[in-house]
Amino acid sequence: AEDLFKCDVFVFVASKGIPPVGSGVKDVRMYQFENNSKIVAQYARQARKENFKGLFAVVSDPVDPLAKTAWLESNKDDSGVLDYQGLRPEQVHGFGLGVMNARAAYFAKRDERFKRFLTEGRSFGPHGQDLVVADSITDYNDELSKELTELTVTANLHMRAIGFKPFIAPAYSSGAISLVLMMRGEWHCGSVFLGGIYMGVKNRYTAFGLETE
């Protein structure tokens, strides 16, 4: 444990679990946040204690609130007072948007109406209900974008409804693939600190710092 932060990238994937299918829990992400925020806070405080200078990557759900929790908790002293002596905002990065972008691409490949998304589209926001999918950033169509957003947001609910927990797709699209792209300095989908919150956008790390599209 003492060597945990002797690295360039720390990836937080711990989770206390999710409600079983059919449990009746309506807000799964709030349930996850209540449990996982306590765990991420513990590691964020350890990162502060060890003066960690690398990247603190959050993959566990709900990504965006957990990323902010990690940043805030690392910046509190032993009395719980914010002193901003911990992780810098750009050191914390959330990885949850990748799978939403991939789900939007899945529907775009199956429906001609959405095909522009594959070359002109973008996904913004959190890994959850407040996601915004734009069918095109050059010739935006509000009606099509809202329909594609709805399909994307509810895709995991359909998986749960037929008895599966949708974890493989996020592990690949939001986790493994996006992490590799980030470490290569390539464009990828992820949550970065914008205006006081962690917001999912297309971004990359450069020699001059974080760049958002």
Give the ranges of each region predicted by the language model.
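Structural signal for hydrophobic packing residues in well-ordered secondary-structure cores
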Residues: 11, 18, 74, 180-187
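Rossmann-like dinucleotide-binding core of oxidoreductases
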Residues: 55-139
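Short beta-strand segments
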Residues: 13, 58-59, 194
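Long, compositionally biased stretches enriched for glycine and/or charged residues
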Residues: 100, 108-213
